[in-house]
Amino acid sequence: MDTLPLDGRASVLLAGVDEVGRGPLAGAVVAAAVILDPDRPIAGLRDSKRLSAARRSELDRRIRAQALAVSLGRAEVAEIDRLNILQASMLAMQRAVAGLDPAPVQALVDGNRAPALPCPAQAIVKGDDRVPAIAAASILAKQARDAEMRALAEQYPGYGFERHMGYPTTEHLQALRTLGACPAHRRSFAPVRRCLLG
């Protein structure tokens, strides 16, 4: 993994920030913020989408055990529908960073846009492949959101949330047509809105 050069205090209290769940039709957007310990590097950190479930689970445990600070933030379905998915994602990331203790001196955020934060923040395209702290955040966020979607699958059976995690797969779209929308669905997303309009 290429790492971006940092120096001084920022390298110690640098938060990596990422979110998961912008594209799904159901469930919250979950963000994570992580401050890694530079004296305890964690091998194998990379974009969560490129890791097996078993490897993500193992790294999730190691990150939580070795990081200086970790925090999760979320934006609920009602907030996504009220704000829009971009603003809800920014809100989830702000909440994740606000939960860090100690507070970061700098934040590096995956993507092309960073939320307004109480510390300097820089957006980094493909940051989850370039910055270990962002990769760590992507792993924690994905693990947390996947667990939430498995719980929603038990609460709302028949949609297959445990398999597609709310993304608009053929299975999910068919279930929407057959069962209609459940409270976990994002009403502002076109496929759900079409279903509600009949």
Curated annotation (Swiss-Prot):
Its EC number is 3.1.26.4. One of its GO terms (molecular function) is RNA-DNA hybrid ribonuclease activity. Residues 12-198 form the RNase H type-2 domain. It is found in: Cytoplasm. Keywords: Cytoplasm, Endonuclease, Hydrolase, Manganese, Metal-binding, Nuclease. It catalyses: Endonucleolytic cleavage to 5'-phosphomonoester. It is an enzyme of class 3 (hydrolase). Transmembrane segments: none annotated. GO terms for biological process: DNA replication, removal of RNA primer; mismatch repair. It holds the Pfam family RNase_HII. Its cofactor is Mn(2+); Mg(2+). GO terms for cellular component: cytoplasm; ribonuclease H2 complex. PANTHER family: RIBONUCLEASE H2 SUBUNIT A, RIBONUCLEASE HII. NCBIfam families: PRK00015.1-3 (NF000595), PRK00015.1-4 (NF000596). This is Ribonuclease HII.
